[in-house]
Amino acid sequence: LLGEPVEARFGKDFPIRFDFLDTVGGGNLSVQVHPTTQFIRENFGMYYTQDESYYLLDAKEGATVYLGLKTGIDKNEMIEDLRKAQKGEIVFNTEKYVNKLPAKKHDHYLIPGGTVHCSGSEALVLEISSTPNLFTFKLWDWQRLGLDGKPRPINVERGKEVIDWKRDTEYVKQHLANHLTKISEGDGWREERTGLHPNEFIETRRHWFTKPVTHHTNNSVNVLNLIEGEEAIIESCLL
């Protein structure tokens, strides 16, 4: 099922997870950061972290994604504002510190560990990620309360240890936002790579086709998701 290269690295763990994040008619998700591989190994004994990406399945008017830090911010000031917000002393000014990007259907944003991010409102996001999902450090949750009537748990102190402060506006534009590479094309089909950051092991490819096409798994696990159209019929062929 996994293929020998994947099984050799991850054992019996299935390393890929798809989640659907629906904020259409709702609010922003929590501003958060996932730990780097080094941090999660040294502190939690795991050998890979939750790198992920956002693929926009749909986006209504005003849809946004928050990704990376604004160039030139004062990191000490940002952390202090997060601490004050956690205590209820201020409302954290997210747009002062975090890039707010307009989002449209079929956009793809890479989110390697250490990158501050969240999905904004009015978006339907396919979140493609690796599987250690217990290590999300939330930084700000827009003053929302839990079922107990108290502010939802926030982990600023852990989060500040893993934020990659070099992931600023320019870095996001150059490395994380909509980097499309054409792999190949033919009569009635086109294959594109939409994401693979050097720190990540999940490569994402997008296939457009109007007639039957053949794809090779290359001795690795492949997870498919229909992003346009009503249905696709997939048949396995043993060679």
Describe these PLM feature segments.
Residues 1-105, 118-230, 234-238:
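Active-site region of the double-stranded beta-helix
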Residues 108, 112-114:
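Glycine-rich, mobile lid/loop segments that gate access to catalytic sites or pores
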